[in-house]
Amino acid sequence: IIAMENHPVRWTTPLGLPVVQPYRKLGRHLIKTSLQILTLQRETDKVMVKRQRTAFPPNFVHSLDGSHMMMTAIACKESGLSFAGVHDSYWTHASDVDQMNKILREKFVELYDAPILENLLESFQQSFPDLQFPPLPERGDFDLREVLESPYFFN
């Protein structure tokens, strides 16, 4: 919907980091010299509608994963734990794994207890007041707090 209006899809993560999908159509510019012809490719002002649409779901989920990682890293630091991570792999000293597992579950519940989709829709509506967005799906009945007791939630 947004890309069809020639705007890149953008949102703000739960931690306040702005994200803008950079996918724009490329244009060619020929430069002729006495020795050769060079072709330069540059982004145009037109967005790639299909790429904006297909990239948004995984990019949005990755931004939530990154928010969860940062929340976990900050909480580990505040608890005196060493923390390292790449994508969805989190590391600490072997003696601190149980404490880190507890922290990452707590931060997951904290993150997803927030009205993430509601906030996303509201930001889209504020940024594009003339566009009509579909309603959000209803929330399911899963008790997010079950994650706190799940031994295999994140392992």
From Swiss-Prot:
<dbReference type="Pfam" id="PF00940">
    <property type="entry name" value="RNA_pol"/>
</dbReference>
<feature type="active site">
    <location>
        <position position="88"/>
    </location>
</feature>
<dbReference type="InterPro" id="IPR046950">
    <property type="entry name" value="DNA-dir_Rpol_C_phage-type"/>
</dbReference>
<dbReference type="InterPro" id="IPR002092">
    <property type="entry name" value="DNA-dir_Rpol_phage-type"/>
</dbReference>
<comment type="similarity">
    <text>Belongs to the phage and mitochondrial RNA polymerase family.</text>
</comment>
<dbReference type="GO" id="GO:0005739">
    <property type="term" value="C:mitochondrion"/>
</dbReference>
<dbReference type="GO" id="GO:0006351">
    <property type="term" value="P:DNA-templated transcription"/>
</dbReference>
<dbReference type="InterPro" id="IPR043502">
    <property type="entry name" value="DNA/RNA_pol_sf"/>
</dbReference>
<dbReference type="GO" id="GO:0003899">
    <property type="term" value="F:DNA-directed RNA polymerase activity"/>
</dbReference>
<keyword id="KW-0804">Transcription</keyword>
<dbReference type="GO" id="GO:0009536">
    <property type="term" value="C:plastid"/>
</dbReference>
<dbReference type="GO" id="GO:0003677">
    <property type="term" value="F:DNA binding"/>
</dbReference>
<keyword id="KW-0808">Transferase</keyword>
<protein>
    <recommendedName>
        <fullName>DNA-directed RNA polymerase 1A</fullName>
        <ecNumber>2.7.7.6</ecNumber>
    </recommendedName>
</protein>
<keyword id="KW-0240">DNA-directed RNA polymerase</keyword>
<comment type="function">
    <text>DNA-dependent RNA polymerase catalyzes the transcription of DNA into RNA using the four ribonucleoside triphosphates as substrates.</text>
</comment>
<keyword id="KW-0548">Nucleotidyltransferase</keyword>
<dbReference type="GO" id="GO:0000428">
    <property type="term" value="C:DNA-directed RNA polymerase complex"/>
</dbReference>
